[in-house]
Amino acid sequence: MSAPLGPGLLGGVFDGLLRPLSEAGTWLAPATTGHTVPDHRWDFTPSVRAGADVDAGDELGVVTTDGPIPIPILVPADVAGGVDSIRGRGAYRADTVVATVSGTAVPLTQPWPVRRPRPSRDRIDDVEMLPTGQRVLDLLFPIARGGTAAVPGGFGTGKTMLLQQIAKWCEADVIVYIGCGERGNEMADVVQELQDLVDPRTGHRLAARTVVVANTSNMPLMARESSIYSGVTVAEYFRDLGYHVVVIADSTSRWAEALREFSSRLGELPAEEGYPADLASALAAFYERAGHVVTLGGRRGSVTIIGAVSPSGGDMTEPVTAHTLRFVRSAWSLDRELAYARHYPAVAWSGSFSTDAQAVGLRRARDGDPDWTRRRARVAAVLADADRLDALAELVGRRAMPDAERVVMLGGRLLREGVLQQSALSPSDGFCSTAKAAALADAALALLDRCRSLVEAGVDADTLEGVDFGPLIQAREQAGPDDAATVDRIRDAMLARLGELS
């Protein structure tokens, strides 16, 4: 199977075979797919003249669209030489040949086999953090551009909502959202919200930078099985154009179930829990297509892959989850108890990890945030100590605990409620910049340090627990998405109030 790569992908909704669904009357129904991409005419402007020498990946021209992202037309990966002919500026259909290079016709839309990774010149080792707009991820479990992450979690823990928030607000040029085997109403909500929301960086609708591959649970087996490959192939295409792309797959467990069903129909011998024996190889091949690269044309682009995993009954030892955790560099494990306590995002700070954190800390220090690593370590340590002391307090009672330990428990509550919790429905808190996240974390840690010094000076823990810390907890919604100054003012006011107790 090959995917048609060219203008018309951005803002579109497709099935797993990359057939457009956007203009169907009821696009989630397995009915007529509506008009196809080649029916539209695109404005093409040539960048080279006939007779010029070009290599694979070089730009032949540019297609301008109504959105914020221009689409360069590149020399195919296996073609190089002189430009025999090239069309002038004008509007052309997607299947129109706009140039001929060494006897090879180059149309606006070029096919590519979805199971074959697109080539690149080199991989970039330098780590650059991908801001997601979610504080718990950007503070504790960062993901690098070109990295991989898994989001394992049981039913009702908020996987889809977290992935939708990342799709809306992460700092990427293009988002490829793959809904594989999900409920139709969830896919409809994603498409509608992307149409309604505005990208604060470009001023265009978020849908203008998004490609949605919608495969609901009632769609054919082959569409579900191929949707993952189609989506990552589209992502590699935009990477080759020089863009930073994020692929969100929700969920890889449904894709693995399609593999299991297909393998069963072929009569193959099943492996653990009925999955095919090559499940691990298939997952590895998918996640290995992520990367931060130098393209054939010398541009820089990246594909970051974030995949949800839906283990049955929350069993993290089942094959899909176990194999996925072997191949990803970050895991954001969702905790059922946090979700039931209405703590969202329900990312468990004790069960998640990021192998990119150390390299991200070095890069953040070079970029002007030298305290990033120290801040992350302190937040993680306070949360771990607070969890341990909270469990002990349930046995002996809070008042039986020493004042110094009660202050640590207070600091853990400030971090949980004032920093890590985030409302996806709030206009000012749904997205959070790295500067505001750092200001909130620094404010909570500063208040904790002041409370510790007050306890050492003789102030009892009952007095400190009676202080109203509501302004800090409310600061995450009162301050704008990028308003760190308001958080700093609230911190200073709270520190002054605590100073009156000494």
Whereabouts are the PLM-identified features?
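P-loop NTPase nucleotide-binding/switch module
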Residues: A24-T65, I71-P76, Y92-G147, L162-Q165, ...
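N-terminal accessory targeting/assembly segments
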Residues: M1-E23, W27-P30
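Conserved beta-strand residues within beta-sheet cores
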Residues: S2, P7-L10, R41, T45, ...
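Conserved hydrophobic positions within beta-strands
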Residues: V13, E59, V83-R87
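P-loop NTPase catalytic core
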Residues: L139-L140, G146-F469
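Glycine-rich, histidine-containing beta strand-loop boundary motifs that form or position
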Residues: L5, L17, G25, D58, ...
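C-terminal amphipathic alpha-helical interaction region
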Residues: V455-S502
